[in-house]
Design a protein with these regions (language model features):
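Positively charged, structured surface patches that bind polyanionic biopolymers
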Residues: 35-69, 90
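Generic detector of low-complexity/intrinsically disordered segments
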Residues: 18, 54-55, 60, 64, ...
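Anion-binding and metal-coordination hotspots
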Residues: 1-28, 34-35, 39, 45, ...
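Basic, short loop/linker segments at the boundary and entry of helix-turn-helix/winged-helix-like folds
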Residues: 62-107, 112
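Short arginine-rich
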Residues: 131-135
Length: 469
């Protein structure tokens, strides 16, 4: 008789899960070894050491509509570079780089926010667009910097040529033009500036220091002559004396410039608070948009009222006031674009009475704020006819308070400010690299030329414009 089984003996024992064996066999899907977490997933093949077969044609490295292609086509087939080529002569030694190569590199760099010669040197080595534009040649930073310095005036002339291409592309209307200015830092510290009053004090101090060193040097010379004989060269000036004489010379030069400027303005002498900077004497201390005092230049733009915001003229001054810039900007706009704009608008910084009189004589429909807070006040539109005895400022004040005047002036802000925002924020241009008003003016035109290139490229119309050109 079989033995009876207990309840425990009758229970079914489930199969236990078997551990997944680890393996280092390649994954069929990826060809990669399993690496623990995530190893069961499939990824695209990745091998940094894989040999690539790149096209030997550098032109195939860039997409069809790339900015680099626009710049290459523009430099090769449109721009007149005769001024640049005329400066080269047949000399012995290694031949220089092709000017088109360096020009393309500069234009692409400035249009991409790369301004310094050292960064441009690295870009020519590392960035595909720059290697395409330079045909895979790598000029050093000294060559790039010297090319920019040597041909700065010729580069300025290219601004007008690029503007003409923008006109042919239909990006310019020249109906309403807005003027505006901004303060951009000079390549100099405001702490290197000194007032005229302080210069007079320091001049006396340095004169005493120099005289003391000269007397000490003379005494040493006499003592050494008695001991060693009169066989010294006599040009072994102490380092402290050389430094003091150098500072005294620079101080006198800056002081003389202030005095000359005062005489040209019909004044006997400069005010004690007037300053000069020793690093860049032509720059001035100005108040920027953040209400901070900076060593800067006053940079001006004339912007066309279209969705493309093309810059028609770009100038630089070293006076904080915008008033002296209005007429030069108007003339430059007419020269660059080939005609005078129908209408202009500007803020209160340009409202000098002589400016308003000239604009009226030229028949230009101008809308210029007369008071700084004029358009922040809620005032009713004027009624009735204006008095015959009203002066230019009163007439302009009344004109800009009309319904049409308010609309035009409100439009000004949306026309003039975007280029400054793109140049400062988009390109990152906030300080000049060069020094001196002439060089800074050239650098500003190069920056705005590059800005217009970006507008031309972004419009998508550059191919047809280059074909017409």
């Amino acid at each position: 008789m079989p033995e009876s089984r207990g309840a425990a003996d009758q229970m079914q024992i489930p199969d236990l899960p078997q551990p997944v064996p680890t393996t280092t066999e390649p994954d069929d899907a990826t060809g990669n070894e399993s690496l623990g977490v995530g190893a069961e997933k499939s990824f695209r093949p990745y091998d940094p050491n894989q040999i690539l077969l790149l096209s030997p044609n550098l032109a195939e490295w860039l997409p069809a509509g790339h900015l680099g292609r626009l710049i290459s086509e523009l430099v090769d087939n449109v721009l007149d570079l005769s001024w640049i080529y005329a400066s080269y002569r047949e000399l012995r030694g290694a031949p220089p780089y092709e000017p088109r190569l360096l020009l393309k590199l500069l234009l692409y760099g400035y249009a991409s926010g790369i301004f310094s010669s050292r960064r441009l040197e690295r870009a020519a080595q590392e960035l595909v667009p720059c290697r395409y534009l330079t045909a895979d040649q790598q000029p050093d930073h000294k060559t790039i910097s010297e090319f920019r310095r040597r041909h700065l005036k010729a580069l300025n002339e290219l601004f007008g040529q690029v503007l003409q291409v923008c006109q042919k592309a239909g990006l310019v209307k020249l109906g309403h033009v807005a003027l505006d200015g901004t303060k951009i830092k000079a390549n100099a510290s405001k702490h290197k500036a000194m007032s005229y009053g302080r210069m007079k004090e320091r001049e006396t101090e340095y004169e005493k220091i120099v005289q003391g060193w000269l007397e000490q040097a003379e005494a040493i010379d006499q003592a050494e002559d008695e001991e060693f004989g009169k066989d010294r060269r006599g040009d072994e000036l102490p380092e402290e004396l050389q430094r003091a004489e150098s500072r005294l010379r620079k101080l006198r030069e800056a002081k003389a410039e202030l005095e000359k400027e005062a005489q040209e303005q019909g004044r006997e002498a400069p005010a004690d608070k007037e300053q000069r900077n020793f690093s860049d004497p032509e720059s001035r201390i100005m108040v920027n948009g953040e209400k901070a005092f900076v060593q800067a230049y006053n940079c001006q733009l004339a912007v066309d009222d279209t969705p493309h915001h093309v810059v028609l003229a770009a100038e630089v001054g070293n006076q904080a006031s915008d008033n002296p810039q209005l007429l030069p900007m108007l003339i430059r706009t007419a020269l660059n674009a080939g005609e005078v704009p129908d209408r202009i608008s500007a803020d209160a910084g340009y409202s000098r009475e002589t400016n308003l009189i000239v604009l009226d004589k030229l028949g230009i429909d101008a809308y210029i704020a007369v008071d700084k807070d004029q358009h922040s006040r809620q005032e009713p539109s004027p009624r009735g006819r204006i008095r015959k005895s009203a002066g230019p400022r009163e007439r302009m004040r009344r004109k800009t308070r009309t319904k049409k005047g308010r609309a035009v002036y409100k439009r000004r802000k949306h026309v003039a400010e975007p280029p400054f925002g793109f140049i400062k924020q988009g390109l990152g241009f906030r300080q000049f690299l060069l020094r001196g008003l002439e060089k800074v003016s050239g650098e500003w035109k190069l920056v705005t030329l590059a800005y217009n290139l970006r507008r031309l490229h972004d419009s998508g119309r550059w191919r047809s414009a280059l074909a017409i050109a």
